[in-house]
Amino acid sequence: MPDITYYPAETRQLGAYVAHPRGQGPWPGVVVVMDALGLSDDIRIQADLLAAAGYLAFAPDLYSGRGIKCVVATLQASRSGAGEAYEDIEAARHWLTERADCTGRIGIIGFCMGGGFALLSAPRYDFAAASVNYGDVPKDAVDRLAGASPIVASYGKRDPELKGRAQRLETALTALNIEHDIKEYPNVGHSFMNRINAGPVLGPLTKFVRMNYDHPSTEDAWRRILDFFDAHIRDADA
């Protein structure tokens, strides 16, 4: 049953959404990193999908207890690789490892801004695998991703903000000999896996970056993610 909980980060308590699989644990865990819209209903849906697949899903609210200025700071951190949000993500991973209903094998998944965090957390923290969904890729990816966990990533070819990122990531991970599965979907744009209720304020932005949920591409992306996580997180427990 999903619930809201609080967990200790470096300097404060943070809220989080937790989705538990059915049946008896322990289960492998996944930290679910939100997009710029925050801990939305959509991010809860992503966590629920992971729980249905047998993963203890933990989605921290990186905006907890901070004002509107934290949104800009958190967005910048997802690209720079520096900032308090990374400490919060590591605290989330640690929270999972301390639970009796978790095997201690933890993955990370992120969407948009969260995809950037997932990518740069892969070489930094002890994650067994990472799923990057339309997250930015730094130009110096070869330097920044050395020692990263295996990575599965999905991008939309029609995303005007992230042109060439799928190929940049593919090139870097190949050079580093890091196991990966990178796919660029030809007919979709940004956030194609997310059901976003944009409203009047964000509506123009969603049109600019072609943010439209696409069911066939989403189904294929989730199939790849779960196959990848099963191989690198779940099967490693056997």
State the predicted function of each range.
Residues 4-101, 195-212:
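Serine-hydrolase catalytic machinery in alpha/beta-hydrolase-like enzymes
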Residues 46, 163-173:
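Short alpha-helix in the alpha/beta-hydrolase fold that links the catalytic acid
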Residues 89-148:
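Primarily recognizes the serine-hydrolase "nucleophile elbow" in alpha/beta-hydrolase
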Residues 138-148, 159, 223, 227, ...:
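Conserved serine/cysteine hydrolase catalytic core
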Residues 146-151, 176-179:
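Short, proline-enriched alpha-helix->beta-strand connector loops that line the catalytic pocket
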Residues 152-155, 185:
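Short beta-strand/loop motif that positions the catalytic acidic residue
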Residues 157-163, 190-191:
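Acidic catalytic loop of the alpha/beta-hydrolase fold
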Residues 179-238:
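C-terminal catalytic histidine-bearing segment of alpha/beta-hydrolase fold enzymes
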